[in-house]
């Protein structure tokens, strides 16, 4: 099998950034993601703040939705990639106001879509899979 075909059959990765996996918003998103049987996906749970490069990419995808989750996006994009916030535990980011504790963030890197609610998942992602 060619390399292209091998990659083609790999499940897509959807990342769920959450500071508290047992929270209702994270569990609701996980349930919605797992109920999608149309395509095989790997759900990656991430409890660390995105890297500077990831944050820049996410802002290009959908800055308004990203700012619902990361209210300080604009000022954070001006920080150096080495800033200790990037890659730090999300619980610490909740405490310093860099992460919205009321929601979680889902990202489909391949399809370049993101959101913070089950509704956004249904509107932006589920019908297009």
Curated annotation (Swiss-Prot):
The keyword Zinc does not apply. Residues 1-21 form a transit peptide. InterPro entries: Fmp46, Thioredoxin-like_sf. One of its GO terms (molecular function) is oxidoreductase activity. Coiled coil: none annotated. Its main location: mitochondrion. Keywords: Mitochondrion, Oxidoreductase, Transit peptide. The active site is at residue 93. Disulfide bonds: none annotated. Gene3D superfamilies: Glutaredoxin. Belongs to the FMP46 family. This is Putative redox protein FMP46, mitochondrial. It comes from Kluyveromyces lactis (strain ATCC 8585 / CBS 2359 / DSM 70799 / NBRC 1267 / NRRL Y-1140 / WM37). The lineage of its organism: Eukaryota, Fungi, Dikarya, Ascomycota, Saccharomycotina.
């Amino acid at each position: 099998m060619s390399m292209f075909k091998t990659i083609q059959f790999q499940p897509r990765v959807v990342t769920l950034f959450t500071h508290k996996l047992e929270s209702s918003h994270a569990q609701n998103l996980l349930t919605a993601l797992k109920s999608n049987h149309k395509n095989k996906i790997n759900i990656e749970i991430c409890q660390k703040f995105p890297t500077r490069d990831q944050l820049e990419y996410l802002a290009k995808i959908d800055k308004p939705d990203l700012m619902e989750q990361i209210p300080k996006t604009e000022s954070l994009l001006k920080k150096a990639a080495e800033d200790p916030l990037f890659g730090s535990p999300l619980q610490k980011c909740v405490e310093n106001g860099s992460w919205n504790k009321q929601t979680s963030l889902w990202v489909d890197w391949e399809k370049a879509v993101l959101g913070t609610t089950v509704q956004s998942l249904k509107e932006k992602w589920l019908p297009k899979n």
